[in-house]
Amino acid sequence: MSIKNAVKLIEKSKARFVDLRFTDTKGKQHHFTVPARIVLEGPEEWFENGQAFDGSSIGGWKGIQASDMQLRPDASTAFVDPFYDDVTVVITCDVIDPADGQGYDRDPRSIARRAEAYLKSSGIGDTAYFGPEPEFFVFDGVEFETDMHKTRYEITSESGAWASGLHMDGQNTGHRPAVKGGYAPVAPIDCGQDLRSAMVNILEGLGIEVEVHHSEVGTGSQMEIGTRFATLVKRADQTQDMKYVIQNVAHNFGKTATFMPKPIMGDNGSGMHVHQSIWKDGQNLFAGDGYAGLSDTALYYIGGIIKHAKALNAITNPSTNSYKRLVPHFEAPTKLAYSAKNRSASIRIPSVNSSKARRIEARFPDPTANPYLAFAALLMAGLDGIQNKIHPGDPADKNLYDLPPEEDALVPTVCASLEEALAALKADHEFLLRGGVFSKDWIDSYIAFKEEDVRRIRMAPHPLEFEMYYSL
């Protein structure tokens, strides 16, 4: 969509406001809202100059001594917000550093743009396609509190396995999925059909093509909405829009949606499998006549991801909660291997009917990942594999959780904690710096920023510690 078409959308919808959105390092969207008349008074100038804001108020960004930042709207992203009472056109923005007029080196969307530019400049390909699958839970309610004398959380979900013995307005229907029993049953066990359909209707209205929606494995209403792939920056934009729609539709239904990887103990967590392929001159470079129909280029791309996986974990699995999901036997891929069939491997090659659909699927990321950063980092790791012809070795076509100890010890794993992942990123990040995609300043500031998460968890007594140690 051009500036001209964005202006037409504002005029045709009779929008009262324009909502400018951007994403911080953690992956959370922020927004500033301006009256639509300001845009219409001089659209070309407004789209060029954007909106100034205080960058020091965004965690992990500028200090207060040099905090001026600029939002530059991307007209191609404009859509009418489906939730606001007053008609409002939403536009996603790049964050610009006024010092040089370029994308701020800590702005996730600018990093993603630089990754796309680096792919083209490398000569390897001209387009990278990404197709994430963010899973999520929808609960009836959640309570949590942390204080110096009290720490607790409690999830309320009529569809949770733990609710079988509860009185619910004097009646308990009994229809709910068991632990690990939530995958695609019909109603009344699947109580989220209408909710998901409402989400899908809005997503399709925003131009995000939905391919399927269904309940997922976890009890307590775990869900997935599968959407079509797109180019890197566009697909990251759509992932942010998806999260916004999912959380707001749930809110309007009187429920609460979360993308936490592991909100429920003892059941499957939520991942964000990321499908990827590289194209050049209209040809899929991952299609070939090798293992599972892959080309050498695709195998080298896999090799790069496996080589750098522990460093990638700091970006693709950026929360302390991420590593409560990445444990064996909960359908979470912990083994750094690849396979055409084996879902215990961290890289899977989906079965497809066409060479155009040939792709690889990274299964270890989760939806707390900032999509701009995660997709850019995965691409950079894969490109390093292609550039240096890093072969991933033989595929792993047997259950990696059932290997004998001597074989199991030979298969590398993803990180076991955020602390380990940050240490890996500190030691292995040169591949991210190529083409100026990520900066050394970003690496250092990101590690320091996320180490605060590690510190907070390390300093907080856990209720399980009282169970295990209080009476010793």
Curated annotation (Swiss-Prot):
It comes from the Bacteria. Its cofactor is Mg(2+). Mg(2+) 2 binds at residues 135, 216, 224. L-glutamate binds at residues 268-269, 325, 331, 343, 363. Keywords: ATP-binding, Cytoplasm, Ligase, Magnesium, Metal-binding, Nucleotide-binding, Phosphoprotein. ATP binds at residues 211, 275-277, 343, 348, 356. Pfam families: Gln-synt_C, Gln-synt_N. Residues 108-472 form the GS catalytic domain. Residues 13-101 form the GS beta-grasp domain. The keyword S-adenosyl-L-methionine does not apply. The keyword Magnesium applies. Catalyzes the ATP-dependent biosynthesis of glutamine from glutamate and ammonia. This is Glutamine synthetase. It comes from Neisseria gonorrhoeae. The gene is glnA.
